[in-house]
Amino acid sequence: FWDKYGTFFILAIIVAIFGTLSSEYFLTTNNITQIFVQSSVTVLIGMGEFFAILVAGIDLSVGAILALSGMVTAKLMLAGVDPFLAALIGGVLVGGALGAINGCLVNWTGLHPFIITLGTNAIFRGITLVISDANSVYGFSFDFVNFFAATPLGIPVPVIFSLIVALILWFLTTRMRVGRNIYAPVSYTHLTLPTILLV
C-alpha cells in the first residue's frame, strides 16, 4: 500500500504543513470544502485524460473541450432550455462529439495524438470565443445554481458527481473485461519488441 500511495500521502502532508503555516484558515472545513469543489472539474478532466494516456496517447484539447461544451451548456440554458438538465446533457453530447472528432482524426490521418489535439485545442478555443463573443456568460436560473450549491449529507454536489464517475470508471477498468482489455495492449507492448527486432 505504501509503495503505491506513499508519495501521495507525503505530498498531502507537505501541502497541509505549508498551507497551515501560510494561513490559519487553510485547514478549516469551509476552505477544504471549497478546495474539493474547485478540484472536482479538474478531477473529471483528469479521469478522461487517464484513458487517453492508458492507450499510449494524449489529449491536449481537454481544456478547450471543457470550455466549448460548458459554453454550449450555458447558451442553451440562457436560450430557455428547460429543465437545465437537458442543457447539461446537450453539453455532455457536445463534449463527446469533440472527443470523437479527435479520435477519428488520429485514426484517419495516422498522426500522433499530440499533433492532432494541439491543433484541435486551438480550433475549439476559437469556436468558444466566437460563441461567447469573448465575454463572460451570466444570468443562470436559480434552479441550476441551487442544484450545484446543494450539500446533501454535507457533501457538495460537484464532489458527489466526481466520486460517482470515479467509482464507475474504477469498476469499468478493474472489474469488467472491456476495461481490462484497455490495459492489455499497453501492458504487453514491451513483449512484442524483441520479436519485431528479430524479424
Spell out what each predicted region is:
Residues 10, 14, 44-45, 69, ...:
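Alpha-helical transmembrane segments in multi-pass membrane proteins
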Residues 44-48, 68-69, 97-101, 124, ...:
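Membrane-embedded alpha-helical core segments of multi-pass
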Residues 1-8:
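N-terminal membrane topogenic signal
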Residues 11-18, 163-168:
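Hydrophobic core of alpha-helical transmembrane segments in multi-pass integral membrane proteins
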Residues 109, 113-176:
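Transmembrane helix-bundle core of multi-pass membrane transporters
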Residues 81-121:
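Alpha-helical transmembrane segments within multi-pass membrane transporters and channels
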